[in-house]
């Protein structure tokens, strides 16, 4: 998220392709969105599932085992990178992946990021629709990640923890009738329906991206604008002088945030919250700003990020139209 939209623009200008990796969830979600729009449906929400409880935002590489041991059969802890896996658990990975989807599809984040509502795969259309229609979303046209765990800690049956989904709206009585007749997992009103993929295979399907780029000059999902960012958010009360340890560490997690808010408030992108020292205290749950850390303005990653902020200083500057 630090510079993806800028890199995609550079690749296109050079005649190349900048692509999400097929097989990982963001590219699969982009395919869901493309399918829905090409078929003439309005995309209400798109996203994935994960294992989530609110206290996971405070998890760290030392105590993440308490979570991992509940659902993974780990025979040798040395085979696991706890910092990496902690980023999967603490909400960071979900924020990164849903931001990638927003920047590639034209969907937008909710104003307070992801809410992780528990949902079975059969409840997607009931849960992932606007609150005004009885769902959990603040509006249509957003991303959301559903949880495979209820807030009381019990597992959700028929969850989508490894899968992806899209929720669509039927604009006609005929479409809504088809949702029911063809078992498109409609909500109780019949107005909304869902399509899901139960699994993703990560790198095992990457060859599809390579073939698509090489043979058709077509990415399997790529940024078209800067709509969503991932900002460093304090896992606990942080003290001035502490050294931040980045994604999956002890200090911060990555929260999906509308890009215009990130730019307006000068929020610190998660990708640059590593090996930088805090200049002031930050309360637990607080979003860090550039001014809160002692960063090197000459660092190459910082320079590229600042270049992207200048290029996309207004929402969707340079964005291609999303059909």
Model region roles, listed by residue range:
Residues 1, 23-25, 48-49, 249, ...:
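Short, ordered loop/turn segments at secondary-structure junctions
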Residues 1-17, 21-24:
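Rossmann-fold NAD(P)-binding glycine/threonine-rich loop
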Residues 4-7, 32, 98:
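Aromatic/hydrophobic pocket-lining residues that form π-stacking "cages" and hydrophobic walls in ligand
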Residues 12, 23-87:
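Rossmann-like NAD(P)H-binding beta-loop-alpha module
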Residues 13-16, 38-41, 240, 284:
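Short coil/turn connectors at secondary-structure junctions
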Residues 64-323:
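C-terminal catalytic/substrate-binding lobe primarily of soluble NAD(P)-dependent oxidoreductases
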